[in-house]
Design a protein with these regions (language model features):
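Sec-dependent N-terminal signal peptides of Gram-positive bacterial secreted proteins and lipoproteins
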Residues: 4-28
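Preferential activation on post-signal-peptide N-terminal prodomains/segments
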Residues: 25-307
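Short low-polarity hydrophobic stretches
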Residues: 100, 399-401, 423
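A short, surface-exposed interaction/processing loop segment used at functional sites
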Residues: 171-172, 176-219, 227, 311-344, ...
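Segments that shape or occlude catalytic/ligand-binding pockets
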Residues: 228, 238-409
Length: 432
């Protein structure tokens, strides 16, 4: 299983100037006693007039966000989609995908000629394999070992088989499920007219190379934003309301979770096919009003020690090519169908303690400008050690600190996650 280490990895990927900026290259001792002893109500009060100062952090323009409520539940979501485990599990996942296909196409019967199975073993992609080949490719049978020998694959290495794909594409509709990242896509290609390629010829997503307007929902007004979609004027505000209300009501497996709500955070208006437009929306997931980490650059690694899980940040994507129509859905790791009970926390580190820990992880020779500090959920992949498929996703409360105007050309934005219970500090995945 993948392990994440502190400074050696962090320093390896950075230029010397960046290495000198972050911890792992400059060791500091934490002298303050850190305890999780503050209620959410106390944190909300602390956030109102936060005036603490740190030698290497500029908080003059920092927005601090603390959720409502009295506690935060640690979330545990089983993800039972490892089709390499057994024939029974394979059939369960296959049946769910076939239900999706029937719902997507509106047909009672799935046309098998349009269904494809693929497997990934490390960087080896097996295309167009049968169900039997699929099982052999993931289970350590004699046939599997013989195939490894023929393809010159180390048997020990191939145990890290991490991906599978079940896909469908008939030219009008396509859908696929990836096991390695618990990602599912649904595409209705009929709307655009100019966009009718099979998945295996590429083009399974709407064309996105002509963005005419990019909108940050948290900052930009959308009151007057309106474009013609498939011959009809559709105000963006109406489109967003429809998607947020209906993304969880599609009936598809792996498209959204009944335990979560979703909010649009970004929209690109895209022109395609000459003079046609559509809305490409990015959504974040929330549990009882508390958001999941949604910035792809905010995934991290502990700056001290190691862990046996993978930290990640994910969003949903929905494209609307016609009014009240979700013509492309991309979901990944925020689409759980089951939930287990987790620990409920009602005491947390103070905001001051969290920022102190970040300051302690940053070189005293630099100053980082923090524009946002938010108490939210950080998500973790827990993967099977044999097939490297996701077995469980855990969501844990952290302070996420975003730093802007870093002065680093390749990294204008930096993120730190501070565990709101233990104080463990994580640095950015993109720096590793």
């Amino acid at each position: 299983m993948r392990k994440h280490f502190k400074g050696a990895k962090l320093c390896f990927a950075l230029s010397l100037s960046i290495c000198l900026t972050l911890c792992g290259c400059e060791k500091k001792e934490t002298k303050r006693e850190i305890k999780a002893e503050y209620t959410l109500e106390q944190l909300r009060e602390e956030s109102k007039n936060f005036k603490a100062e740190y030698p290497n952090l500029d908080l003059s323009k920092t927005k601090i966000i603390i959720p409502d409520g009295d506690n935060i539940e640690e979330l545990i979501f089983p993800v039972d989609i490892n089709i390499g485990e057994s024939e029974e599990n394979f059939e369960k996942v296959k049946n769910n995908v076939y239900e999706n296909i029937r719902l997507l196409t509106g047909k009672d019967k799935v046309e098998e000629k349009y269904v494809k199975y693929s497997a990934c073993e490390k960087e080896v992609l097996l295309k167009d394999v049968t169900k039997e080949d699929r099982m052999i490719s993931l289970i350590g049978t004699p046939e599997h070992k013989e195939r490894e020998k023929e393809r010159n694959i180390d048997p020990e290495e191939s145990k890290s088989a991490y991906g599978f794909m079940i896909g469908y594409s008939d030219g009008d509709y396509s859908t696929l499920l990836w096991g390695s990242s618990f990602m599912c896509e649904f595409t209705n290609k009929r709307v655009s007219g100019t966009w009718k390629k099979k998945y295996y010829e590429a083009g399974h997503r709407p064309p996105d190379d002509n963005i005419v307007r990019s909108i940050d929902i948290s900052k930009d007004s959308i009151d007057d934003v309106s474009y013609v979609l498939d011959g009809k004027e559709v105000p963006l505000k109406n489109a967003i309301e429809y998607v947020e209300e209906n993304i969880g009501k599609t009936g598809y497996h792996y498209a959204a979770s009944p335990f979560l709500t979703y909010e649009v955070i970004h929209v690109d208006v895209i022109k395609y096919g000459g003079d046609k437009y559509y809305y490409a929306m990015e959504l974040k997931a929330l549990y009882k009003g508390i958001p999941f980490s949604s910035d792809m650059y905010a995934a991290g690694y502990p700056l001290e020690g190691e862990v046996d899980y993978e930290i990640f940040s994910e969003t949903h994507h929905v494209s609307m090519l016609a009014e009240n129509s979700m013509d492309f859905i991309w979901s990944s790791a925020n689409n759980y169908e089951e939930k287990k009970e987790g620990e409920v926390y009602d005491k947390f580190l103070s905001i001051d303690d969290a920022m102190y820990l970040v300051s302690n992880a940053v070189s005293s020779s630099t100053t980082l400008h923090c524009d946002r500090v938010e108490l939210l959920y950080r998500t973790e992949f827990h993967k099977d050690s044999t097939y490297y498929c996701i077995k469980e996703v855990q969501c844990h409360p952290v302070y996420q600190v975003r730093c802007v105007n870093t002065g680093l050309p390749d990294y204008p934005v930096l993120f730190f996650n501070v565990d709101a219970i233990t104080g463990m500090v994580e640095g950015m995945d993109t720096l590793i």
